[in-house]
UniProtKB/Swiss-Prot annotation:
Signal peptide limits: none
UniProt record, GO biological process: intracellular protein transmembrane transport; protein import; protein targeting; protein transport by the Sec complex
Residue segments, region Disordered: 533-568
Family stated for the protein in its record: Belongs to the SecA family.
Species this protein is from: Prochlorococcus marinus (strain MIT 9211)
Binding of ATP, residues: 90, 108-112, 509
Protein name: Protein translocase subunit SecA
Chief subcellular location: membrane
Gene Ontology molecular-function annotations: ATP binding; protein-exporting ATPase activity
Membrane topology field: Peripheral membrane protein
Uppermost EC category: translocase
């Protein structure tokens, strides 16, 4: 009602941009006739104008002023280099991002292209722009693909990848625009703040950041802090023994109520993700371990048992992790991707290794950590884009001060979202999914089935194999991950069936009829890999299907026609990666190319990554002087033109049949992830449809739906293959999802509030560290520490309320000598008759003199050594004490929750105690540095030889 009276606020916001869009369109007539060189010269002209203005705020005002002309130049460059012209709605998206907001743009509306506008505009200041994606593959794809526009206009483009050296990282961060993943950026920031020398620092000062899939990074990953850790030794036998004990414990059938223990050894709360031993469980564990008390501080077992219980009940193989090469590798619950190198902390990963009988790796201790919330708030201006942000609008506004603007689609949407079907049992649901997939597949429509875990995707895969339906499987299993781009390239072909675990952040659009451009690149890769790539750099040629029924004949070579002009039949097209057999002339071109490249680059002399890079460059449209790359480019173009004939026919066929059909097999905890899956169908106004299949056994209904849904289902006397469509059930589902979202929002808010305390401390420590690394005024800093220490000693041993005769000056002098041995001649009678301020001033003067003397002694041995020592001792103390402080703060965080029972606010208690602990840490740091500096005795040069 309010919307009708006041008008839609989003529409009002969009209206504001329309005059600027008109200006950009008018400028197009002026910009289009320019030559490439004249277009490039515009960049230098913009930079010159910005160089005349100092200060970020003033520069931003000028950026707003030149925005229409800059956007017009970028649009023209994109037209020439990529063959893509920004639509008007994409220009609006660019302006929204430039203003530091979140642009919600539906799947397939060209978010990646939109980012070129604000990133180019803000990079003109020379302060650097970061474009953040969710994984290395997307960062590389965007840097190569969109980077062409920036490079064409004369800007440098950097890329940060997981395996880069610090030197490569620094070079890439120095570029005008740098593409990176959120985790690489965060870890580089933490590593920079652990550096022992300025030369080790790779990042420069943050300015502007655009986050792709902003909801995935700022919301889904916000519960997990980034942690850099060092190893600590813990007895491995304890993990193994705990796993054995827990295997023999029995889970209680239901949670205990009203303080009464349930029957069983332990209870599990799936909502809170906790496991708790009952009284019987405690007694049984102690008996099996032959100990008197699980909490005995000399031989603690409780922590190991709790982690082993969680590993048994809450961490499920092929859902939360997979076992690969003898290691437990985490699976990201939002994207379905594996996260090698990441480990659960606090001994949880070791408990899982013990459960799976794997080699148990050392436990770790936190050296540095930060949450994504606080990391991204370090940027003076932050922007983001996603297909689904509106549901989390409030959180973006409250936590990050980011407004959300919904950008209209370029063409109206033609997707049908069919009503959910709910089944009584999981078995009934999966049979229904297999049946619907078969039905739609028979009509020649492509089908995408989204599952929530590796295990479920393999279950459906076996059901489809029974039905003899050829299909592709895309999940976290390593053999499937490597095929990701190939699988997605064919997912839109007639009758293609793709099973994918969590399509969120997959980053590749599903194009109806198939992606001929990508298939041509894959064909080139298939031809060149065996001849150009080193044997030890093992590769796998593209494989069209992971699963097919042996008896079906689908995809067998016998189906492939030898008549080159004919496309493959529908069934066999699904059994091969490529839409048609190439003509003899084209095959000959590929063989000649392969020979030429072997002659140029050497026989099997490249790594797989090097070849991928060269194929990517060849697939670009940017001009090249490299003859080999040009030959590859011509070959890709030739192959693509042949594939296009079939792909375009198939596209018409798929459109007529109704487009892509998306099936969801479970509602995700977040409505956003459901919307992302739906958004795969009907991109850019295409036809398409979606349907969700659910069962009462689904986690969402089981954990958050409450007893209401269960009793409702018992009331339905239906068999398991009968679907139920009920408004009441759908409402229960949506309220369950809202409950979960609120629950997780509260967790993230709590993580943020607690980390805010740490964040203020982190900023103070890191700025102190950076000052030391810069190396300016180190002596002044150390003397400052000494003066503060003298003041603290005076206040510790002198009571101003007592007459001066009663002051214990002997103790005071003794304490001063502990810190400064060079003041050994100091006598208590020298201090008699001085008031407190005079005492402080006298001791501080003595300290300064002693420090000058110490400096002279050290410098005599080696000039410049004193400065090195100052830097070494301050950094050593900051790092050691900060590490201990992080552990102490973690322990405080764990224990402070219990204060709630005493009617105290745990957060306020944490803030107060944390602040006291921080002050104590800084005091210890100052005192330790002073003590170390005076005790420092370098070995004479002759001793070192």
């Amino acid at each position: 009602m309010l919307k009708l009276l006041l008008g839609d606020p989003n529409a009002r916001k969009l209206k504001r941009y329309l005059p600027i869009v008109s200006d950009i369109n008018l400028l197009e007539e002026e910009i289009s006739p320019l030559t490439d060189d004249e277009l490039r010269a515009k960049t230098a002209d913009f930079r010159e104008r910005l160089a005349k203005v100092s200060g970020l705020e003033k520069q931003r005002e000028l950026l707003d002023e030149i925005l229409p002309e800059v956007f017009s130049v970028v649009r023209e460059a994109s037209k020439r280099v990529l063959g893509m012209r920004h639509f008007d709605v994409q220009l609006i998206g660019g302006m929204v991002l430039h203003e530091g907001q979140i642009a919600e743009m539906k799947t397939g509306e060209g978010k990646t292209l939109v980012a070129t506008l604000p990133s180019f505009l803000n990079a003109l200041t020379g302060r650097g722009v970061h474009v953040v994606t969710v994984n290395d593959y997307l960062a590389r794809r965007d840097a190569e693909w969109m980077g062409q526009v920036h490079r064409f206009l004369g800007l440098s483009v950097g890329l940060i990848q997981q395996d880069m050296t610090p030197l490569e990282r620094r070079k890439n961060y120095e570029c005008d625009i740098t593409y990176a993943t959120n985790s690489e950026l965060g870890f580089d920031y933490l590593r920079d703040n652990m550096a022992s020398d300025m030369s080790e620092i790779v990042q420069r000062k943050f300015q502007f950041c655009i986050i792709d899939e902003v909801d995935s990074i700022l919301i889904d990953e916000a519960r997990t802090p980034l942690i850099i850790s060092g190893q600590i030794e813990r007895p491995q036998e304890k993990y193994q023994k705990a796993a054995e004990v827990v295997a023999s414990l029995i889970r209680a059938a239901e949670m205990g109520k009203d303080g009464i223990d349930p029957e069983g050894d332990y209870e599990v709360d799936e909502k809170q993700r906790t496991c708790t031993l009952t009284d019987e469980g405690f007694a049984r564990s102690e008996e099996l371990l032959k100990v008197n008390d699980l909490y005995d501080p000399k031989d603690p077992w409780a922590h190991y048992i709790t982690n082993a219980l969680k590993a048994k009940e809450l961490f499920v193989k092929d859902v939360n992790y997979i076992v690969r090469n003898g290691e437990a590798v985490i699976v990201d619950e939002f994207t379905g991707r594996v996260m090698p190198g990441r480990r659960w902390s606090d001994g949880q990963h070791q408990a899982i290794e013990a459960k799976e009988k794997l080699n148990i790796q050392s436990e770790t201790q936190t050296l540095a950590s930060i949450t994504y919330q606080n990391f991204f708030l370090l940027y003076p201006r932050l922007a983001g884009m996603t297909g689904t942000a509106k549901t989390e609008e409030v959180e973006f506004e409250k936590t990050y001060q980011l407004e959300t603007t919904v950008i209209p689609t370029n063409r109206p949407r033609s997707r049908n979202d069919w009503v959910d079907q709910v089944y009584k049992t999981e078995a009934g649901k999966w049979r229904a999914v297999a049946n619907e997939t078969a039905e739609v597949h028979k009509k020649g429509r492509p089908v995408l089935v989204g599952t929530t875990s590796v295990e479920k995707s393999e279950l459906l895969s076996s059901l489809l194999a029974e039905e003899q339906i050829p299909h592709n499987l895309l999940n976290a299993k390593p053999e499937n991950v490597e095929r990701e781009a190939e699988i997605v390239a064919q997912a839109g072909r007639a009758g293609a069936v793709t099973i994918a675990t969590n399509m969120a952040g997959r980053g590749t659009d599903i194009i109806l009829g198939g992606n001929s451009d990508y298939m041509a690149r894959l064909k080139l890769r298939e031809v060149l890999l065996p001849k150009l790539v080193k044997p030890e750099d093992g590769h796998k040629p593209p494989v069209p299907l992971q699963r097919r029924s042996e008896s079906s004949g689908f995809g067998e070579d016998k189906d492939v026609t030898t008549d080159n002009s004919k496309p493959l039949s529908a069934s066999s097209a699904l059994g091969t990666l490529y839409p048609c057999v190439l003509t003899e002339d084209t095959e000959k071109v590929l063989i000649d190319l392969e020979r030429k490249l072997v002659a140029d680059w050497g026989d099997r002399a490249l790594t797989a990554i090097e070849l991928e890079d060269r194929i990517s460059t060849a697939a670009e449209k940017a001009p090249t002087n490299d003859a080999s790359i040009q030959l590859m480019r011509d070959a890709i173009s030739l192959v693509k033109s042949e594939y296009d004939v079939v792909v375009q026919k198939e596209e018409v066929q798929v459109r007529e049949a109704g487009g892509l059909h998306v099936i969801g097999t479970e509602r995700h905890e977040s409505r956003r992830v459901d919307n992302q899956l739906r958004g795969r169908a009907g991109r850019q106004g295409d036809l398409g449809s979606t349907r969700f299949f659910l069962s009462l056994g689904d986690n969402l209904l089981r954990i958050f739906g409450g007893d209401r849904v269960a009793s409702l289902m018992n009331a339905f006397k239906v068999d398991e293959d009968m679907p139920i469509e009920s408004g009441m059930l759908t409402r229960s589902l949506e309220s369950a999802q809202k409950k979960v979202e609120t629950y997780y929002y509260d967790i993230r808010k709590q993580v943020f509030e607690y980390d805010e305390v740490m964040n203020n401390q982190r900023r103070a420590v890191y700025s102190e560290r950076r000052r030391v690394l810069d190396g300016f005024g180190l002596k002044k800093q150390v003397i400052g520490y000494g003066e503060k220490t003298m003041e603290e000693i005076v206040y510790a041993y002198v009571n101003p309320d007592l007459p001066s005769e009663e002051w214990d000056l002997a103790q005071l002098v003794s304490k001063v000598k502990e810190f400064v041995y060079l003041l050994n001649d100091l006598k208590p009678d020298q201090l008699e008759g001085l008031d407190i301020d005079e005492l402080k001033a006298f001791l501080q003067e003595q300290l300064r003199n002693a420090y000058d003397l110490k400096e002279a002694q050290i410098e005599e041995q080696k000039p410049g050594l004193m400065k090195e020592a100052e830097r070494f001792f301050i950094l050593q103390q900051i790092d050691t004490l900060w590490r201990e402080h992080l552990q102490a703060m973690d322990a405080l965080r764990e224990s402070v929750g219990l204060r709630g029972y005493g009617q105290k606010d745990p957060l306020i208690e944490y803030k107060n105690e944390g602040y006291d602990m921080f002050l104590e840490m800084m005091t210890n740091m100052r005192r330790n540095v002073i003590y170390s500096m005076f005790m420092f005795q370098p070995a004479p040069e002759s001793d070192k030889e």
